[in-house]
Amino acid sequence: MTSKPSTRNDYLPRETHNGEYTGDSPEWQLQINITNKIGGINGDIWLSRDGRSVKWCIEDQCLRQFTYNQKIIKAGYIDFEKTPDCFVVVLSDIAHVYMLKNGGSTTVCFPFQIGNAFWYANGVILERETSASFMDGGYDLKPIEFDLKHKYITLTDPMAPFGLISITNTFKGGINSASGNKTDILQDFQLVLFPSDKDKCIAVFLDRNSKVLRFYYSRILSSDQSRKGELTISSTKKTGLDAAGNSQKSGGISKDLRKFSHLTRRSTSINSNSHDFNAAERVLSGNVGNASGRTDIFALPSSCSRRSLSATLDRMGNNIAPTNRAAPSGFFDSSSANTATHSNITPVSQPMQQQQQEYLNQTATSSKDIVLTEISSLKLPDDIIFTSRRLSSILSKLKFLSLRFERREGLLIFHEPTHFCKIWLIDLLPDVLDSIPFKIYGNSPQNMIRLENLKLKEPSRIQAMYIHELLESCLILVSEGQNKEEYKACLYDPFVKITSPSKNISEELTKQNSLPSLQKLFPYPETSFTKLCFEAVKYITSPAFNISFIFLWQSAYSILLSRANDDVVGGLKMEHDAFSLVLSLLILPIPSSSAQEYQEYKEIYERDLFQHLKQDSEITSSVLPRIVIGLHLIREEYSLNVLCRNEHALLGQFLRFATAAMGWPDLWQSYYVPKMDSESKTFLHPREQNSTFFHPLDEPPSITKSLYSITENSSIPLCPFISFSRLVATDTQVELRITPRSFKILGLYELVHSPNFLPDYVLGILSSFKVDKDELQTYPLGILVPLQNILKILEDKLSEVRDNLELLDRADLQRCSAIINSIRSDSKEVLKRGQRDSYMLCKVPLAKNRSSLSKKPSDIYSILSEIVKSASQVPLDGSAMRMSNIQDDEDIDEGRSLKLNAGLIFSEDKRFTHVVSLLAYYRPTKTQFFTTKTEYAQILAQKKYFAKIMALRTCTNGVGWGAVAYATEKPISTQKWVIQPLNLISVFPDDTKITVKAPEDIAHDIVEWGQFHAGVSSGLRISKKATGITGSWIAFNKPKELDAYHGGFLLGLGLNGHLKNLEEWHIYNYLSPRNTHISIGLLLGMSSSMKGSMDSKLIKVISVHLVAFLPSGSSDLNIDLKLQTAGIIGMGMLYLNSRHKRMSDSIFAQLVSLLNVNDEMVADEEYRLAAGISLGLINLGAGQTKLRKWDSSLLGLGDDLPEDVYDSSDVEQNVMYEDLTTKLLEIVTSTYDVENDWIPENSQIGAVIAIMFLFLKSNNFGISNMLKVDLKEILKANINTRPELLMYREWASNMILWEFIGDDLSFIMKDVDIGVKFSELNTDLLPIYYTMAGRILAMGIRFASTGNLKIRNILLSLVDKFLPLYQYPGKQNLDFRLTISVINVLTNVIVVSLSMVMCASGDLEVLRRVKYLHEVASGPYSDLFQEIPSSKSDVSGVTQVTSNTNTPGNSDRERVDETAASLDDERSSNGSDISDPTAYLEDKKDIDDHYGKFISTNLALGFLFLGSGQYALNTSTLESIAFLSMSVLPTYTTPHPLQELKHFWSMAVEPRCLVIKDISTGDAVNNVPIELVVEEDVEKEEVIREISTPCLLPDFSKIKSIRVKMHGYFPLEVNFTKDYSASDFFSGGTIIYIQRKSESVFENKASFRNVEDIHVALKRKAAESKNYSRLNLKNEQGNTTSSQLVESLGIQDLTMVELDTLLSAGNNTALTDSESYNLGLLCSDKNSGDILDCQLELWYKSFGPHDE
């Protein structure tokens, strides 16, 4: 078993002064060939001499060390195709991959032994060990046989399947030779070199038998091709690693390789630095099938994906490694591709192992990653002998070095014992590489490939050679000197055949690990400034001159470094001085050998390279002037960067000297005007002008002058500027490398000053040029200020999100842009600013610029800055700093913000405060009381009656309080949570207080349910986002005696998802006391938290509480029926939307079976209703999978149903749903002549609910019509059926036809003949009332939270008609009382539906009606309907009926005529005796069903102020609609079943309150006008709504755009598209940040169209400032003219401050032409900036103050 690598940090052996590495661990060797430094990651890889340990080091610091129990084959940095920045260690049977970018790691186990490994551009090439063996049953080692065409396999990603290397052509004697045994040939072929990066293309194979090197051109097949030469040929018969003469395998990769790939692999993902190698093993399969007609490698197009296997395909190792690592047993046959097989890790017997290995021979690879084309070969000398066949032994003597130079690639082949050395070269001609003959056969022109010897001037025996790390085309050659103890080193460029001067080195530098020291002997510039100069020289000159110039610079640099002080160790000036020295010596004539100048630089003058360059007349006449022009253009480039003044000055000094020495016009010297001082003087001076150099221009090109000439008010003609691309006669791409700023700014100015330019275009232009804010700030004043002015204009008017917004000071738009970009990239984590970068293995943050790893932090400030940047991941500019002060968006809808926003939303009056007082169950109830009685005893008795009614209201207040106070608390873990108890005290207007006691005055069951509702409301106050709500916290708040309060609290916590991790012992501690309400709250709460999870443990717990789920013969556990009812709903929640057939059958059985309660079989309707709900939840939306119309013949109802127009995109048919629907419809629609034992009537409502959930929103007309109520038929035929069933059927029918629910009165009153049977109230109208209720309830859910005023007004008109009849005493006959009872239900449904439509709006019109019902006690014992003699009567003597003025919302204008009747007469006629005022108080029964009324009013008040007015009901998902439907079940009559479901709306809410905040302060901004473009729900037309914040947004799916426009703030507009919807945009919180406008620099500024206007205004302003010109400037030290003008004119602009600094009195140096034009750019454009101020300042600088 491969052991876990041990890791430790220690220090690397240190380098001594002579380059030898010593220290505590002398056994470490630098691995040159595996130090790749891909992607900018720096560091070296050191391998121990025993090959079992590897170190990753940066400079002298060891970042990580790994030790293994077997030898390391390969270690280094790799960029996999889709997983960049990896550190990989390859062992014989496993590879360890460490992701440097995210700090994770994984292991890749191989199903075969690995002999060697090679890096390549997209991953690793693995060479299988051909000598691997296994132990048979007789304990004899036998070799493992495998197909050698799979000898080399690619790995492009740790989690990807293997790939194949394929060779295309048939080359004589090559791998694909028709002659010879293919197996023997492949056995002897050894890959010795493969290009490790994308810039190189040549791979080399060694034929060990014939000693022939074969060169192959490689192509990497990937989705992202990095170089030309992609395979595009579509037809060829050549094969991959296969014999051309084998007709049976001429199809390339065999079909076996294209079958299911059962590569077994163990892969373990490890976070951070933890390593877990106990990986779970799994077998996956994938199909990479290849059509029979496409067997060649050229059939794949270049853009297609290389694989069809899943990226998660696993590979599992077998037990063939010498380490005896465990492997899975069993052979995976292709016939079991679809069978998930899980094997234990056990030793593998040899027959099974051999079978598995044979299978891997066929399926080991999935596709081709690399295609090789043989192009050349080389026969090695016979004296080269290989003593071993192992690659390490071969490469220890035979060296291969790969070089690349422009479009040429070379390989240096060096055999150290025999000193054999050859250079193989190829010209990479694109036309040839893309040709079909080359791709197939490797055909190429004769001179394209050549073999050369090393052409050294001094022949010597080469001891070692290396590639210079920074000069990849140059070799470092180490050779013997004249004496054997002397050694020399030099650079050699085989492409231009130039050798650098040799340097003597010590013998230690000829040994291993000496490369770093050797490279220091031949330095290369480290500063970007000098590198840029060298790169410019490379483009201007020939390769020979460039290499020669570099070699001369190295000599000059060494000379200057040797003469410098000890404290000088190089740097920018030293590198530039060496650069200037070489150019100066080339420009100046060679002095006499006796001259001091000659002796000073004799070492350079006498170099052959220098003399060769001086003798070349073309260099003198043409090359050097072009170099000077190029350096001048670089200086102009640096003039556009205020941070590069040092570089600008250094180039100016040299160019002034060079132009003078070359005899160019004086304009060139005067243009530079260097600020000379003793330290900065150049060491060379032109002695005389040299006329041999031509000068291309009379005056130097000036970038600022050219820009100035483009402007509108320029006083000079258009002045062109010579670009670098024109100088070197190439395309403009070179300008982006050498002079990017010049290229960008010239293009920008041309576009900005075009006739059709608008400020709106500037962001797009700057974005196309990739100019960011940091770069813009570094441009000089003349360029920066006009651009800033344009951006300021755009900043003030821009409202929509665009690209490159960081250029503007619009943090609000930047924030919106970040959200939108994260949505588009499916990166939700970017929404949270707290995101932090992962760490590397060494726990060092991986910076964006990975090259920073190579540098040590300079100081503590740098370290802290990197930590801050990594932690915040935001740029430290002004906008980001402002954003960092804002709290996380996850808190915007919670706690304190909710409470504050509630006061803002309902700030116009005290409606919210009043509703809170109505719902606060823990406070005494203020009772509205009015009476016609005069005797104290009667009044007191009536008050007691009112107190009882108010006690019922208090018991239901928790239903509404939980909705109003939803998510307003986030308790801390140490906080003791207190549930306020019910307060059953009623306070009357005369301060009389009456206390209601249980069970004396009110039923104990009602009080317990009141406590339960109070507990639920307390739990709902705790936000879903609250943390620390664990089982321990819940147990900490557990009361000593369990009660209904705590049971409800558990349900409230569960509804918000806080019971997911409740420990088992906590569950049993709660269930053991067998408290009914505790058990109900716990089971339903846990089921809600774990809905849809089908958690097995919770299923067992619930099953114990369901008698029907217990095994037959189980003892009677005496489980309360209400608990069983809650348990069956909990089972449906657990199986939510699972469509579990077995559970569906079990639940359906409960719908039609009798229940054993106390040894009595009962058909409890509440239990069956719960079973129907549970069955619907399990199969929620299952009916949407139907395609065809419903077959009504299944029920024997005939074929007279309308055609089903329902259609769905899901083509699957499930017989289970048809059978289930058939059974449910049979329950609903069947009629029976005799009564059945199981009482099907009690199952009908449950069956209707189940059908509704099955076909919810499916628009299935067939099912809907079966449920729909035919009012005309019912009223005509008087069909005997339960009236309330009509309400449920009509409700379900309309919920199925979701899209067809109307929003007008005609939808409610359809088929209702208003003129018939309305003369009096009787039970004949019950079908109409129940049908209306069902339609209104569907309408309320359909348009929930829409705020539809049309629907509101319709429902208000209806409720106003029925309110006078609510609990109206009237006649006491049964028919009338039943009718009034149905009107009560209808009114309750209307009130709840109204509140759902106007959810969270606090609508006053709705509130008035609900408040009336909530506060007024009506019924037969109320004086509300009593006759009160009026002082004024009409002529006929009819008495007016008035109501108490203390009752708000009570109006008598709409009372029906029946109220004029005498209630006393009615009571007397019915035998009612009211002389005894206490007679009716003895009965505790709620005769008039006040409890049901208060459930509806509390629910309505809760919805009306849901979440303090900041939450909305979500109807976009089936689950949300189902939960909302469960909470508004119209069970308002005794015995009020399923009260616990009244809180399930909490799983159907979403925060939708829009809050506007100031992005600078994070404070809320109120009363912000918002303009919404919303799609109407029914008409589907877009309308504009204007609202003010904080406010409730409509359904996110309906919002098309949102616009914020407030005085003093920047406008903001977000338009939603398919790419990012409003729901996505507000997923992190319904908050929008806006930015306050700063004082515009353009306010009160004049606009000037031409120079004349500016001059007139300038003279006027100069005249106004004449008083300041007389000031004694000598007495005003430090006060310049500019500061006086700024103070007097009120200029508040940093531009003037910078201008003042530039033109300060202490600066006596005259401005150069470039600086003058730069300042001229400030005031030459037509804009609204500070032109006048800048002109005035320049005028004072030029002429000074003058007295009048």
Swiss-Prot record:
GO terms for molecular function: identical protein binding; molecular adaptor activity. Coiled coil: none annotated. Residues 1-24, 1435-1479 are annotated as: Disordered. GO terms for biological process: anaphase-promoting complex-dependent catabolic process; cell division; exit from mitosis; metaphase/anaphase transition of mitotic cell cycle; protein K11-linked ubiquitination; protein ubiquitination; regulation of meiotic cell cycle; regulation of mitotic cell cycle. It comes from the Eukaryota. Residues 1451-1468 have a biased composition (Basic and acidic residues). Residues 1435-1450 have a biased composition (Polar residues). Its main location: nucleus. InterPro entries: Apc1, ARM-like. Belongs to the APC1 family. Component of the anaphase promoting complex/cyclosome (APC/C), a cell cycle-regulated E3 ubiquitin-protein ligase complex that controls progression through mitosis and the G1 phase of the cell cycle. The APC/C is thought to confer substrate specificity and, in the presence of ubiquitin-conjugating E2 enzymes, it catalyzes the formation of protein-ubiquitin conjugates that are subsequently degraded by the 26S proteasome. Present with 178 molecules/cell in log phase SD medium. This is Anaphase-promoting complex subunit 1. The lineage of its organism: Eukaryota, Fungi, Dikarya, Ascomycota, Saccharomycotina.
